[in-house]
């Protein structure tokens, strides 16, 4: 697997458009396309091997709001899609899995309702990614609005024995800021967990990608990249496959 396969392009949906937030702030929005479906297709055409879809309206409102767009994306592309944003009940997860997405990212619910979370994992073994959003070294939930007392590793260890797919580790302070990823934090997490870790937040250059790619041996599976792809700092089609 080369660098290109390691990159998971992000398509963040807000108000029906493909956007990017700066450091998780719902007011700091850049719109990159009016049609998220064609944006998703474009990444596939440029050689993406998987996609990361986020329903930002869902994340802030607590339930998925853009299911039809997700359905259209899954129908249009032939690569696996992972989805996150507002999955805070079994029903919400069921409705998203039925669109044909490969994996679902769950953060707040895992923390707030263990029983419901375990029910989801039992129903969809190997399909659930636990989302770990870290803000100032502690895990944040509810669309990054509320901080918990857990460190990322303490939080992850609560779920590492379940039949999940793995973890998505986002450093919110770096997200959309292209200041470089949290290499140490990502490595530390991956080294200490049984399941794979997907990194996210802060990637701004091919150099950053290579640093994360070097962590594959510790269990880092890939990296979600948004802004750096949209701003042309990283050209997917130019990365080795």
Swiss-Prot record:
Record keyword Cytoplasm present: yes
GO CC terms of this entry: cytoplasm
Gene3D superfamilies: Aldolase class I
Enzyme nomenclature, EC number: 5.3.1.16
Any Gene Ontology biological process: L-tryptophan biosynthetic process
Any one GO MF annotation of this record: 1-(5-phosphoribosyl)-5-[(5-phosphoribosylamino)methylideneamino]imidazole-4-carboxamide isomerase activity
Location(s) in or outside the cell: Cytoplasm
Pfam families referenced in this protein's UniProt entry, alphabetically: His_biosynth
Top-level class of the enzyme under EC nomenclature: isomerase
Taxonomic lineage from the root: Bacteria, Pseudomonadati, Aquificota, Aquificia, Aquificales
CDD domains reported in the protein's UniProt record: HisA
Descriptive protein name: 1-(5-phosphoribosyl)-5-[(5-phosphoribosylamino)methylideneamino] imidazole-4-carboxamide isomerase
Sequence similarity: Belongs to the HisA/HisF family.
Keywords noted in UniProt: Amino-acid biosynthesis, Cytoplasm, Histidine biosynthesis, Isomerase
Main location: cytoplasm
Metal-binding keyword on record: no
Positions of the catalytic residues: 12 (proton acceptor), 133 (proton donor)
Pathway: Amino-acid biosynthesis; L-histidine biosynthesis; L-histidine from 5-phospho-alpha-D-ribose 1-diphosphate: step 4/9
């Amino acid at each position: 697997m080369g660098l290109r396969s390691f990159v998971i392009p992000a398509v963040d949906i807000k108000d029906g458009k493909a956007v990017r937030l700066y450091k998780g702030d719902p007011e700091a929005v850049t719109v990159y396309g009016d049609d998220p479906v064609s944006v998703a297709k474009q990444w596939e055409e440029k050689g993406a091997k998987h996609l990361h879809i986020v329903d930002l309206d869902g994340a802030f409102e607590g339930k998925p709001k853009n299911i039809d767009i997700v359905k259209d994306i899954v129908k249009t592309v032939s690569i696996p899609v992972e989805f996150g944003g507002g999955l805070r009940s079994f029903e919400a997860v069921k409705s998203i899995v039925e669109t044909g997405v490969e994996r679902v990212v769950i953060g707040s619910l895992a923390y707030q309702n263990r029983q419901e979370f375990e029910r989801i994992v039992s129903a969809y073994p190997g399909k659930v990614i636990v989302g770990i959003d870290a803000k100032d070294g502690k895990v944040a939930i509810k669309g990054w609005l509320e901080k918990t007392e857990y460190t990322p590793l303490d939080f992850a260890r609560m779920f590492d024995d379940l039949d999940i797919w793995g973890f998505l580790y986002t450093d919110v302070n770096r997200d959309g800021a292209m200041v470089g990823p949290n290499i140490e934090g990502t490595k530390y997490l991956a080294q200490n967990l049984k399941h794979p870790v997907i990194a996210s937040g802060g990637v701004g250059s091919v150099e950053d990608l290579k640093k994360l790619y070097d962590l594959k041996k510790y269990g880092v599976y890939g990296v979600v990249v948004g802004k750096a792809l949209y701003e042309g700092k990283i050209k997917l089609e130019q990365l080795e496959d």
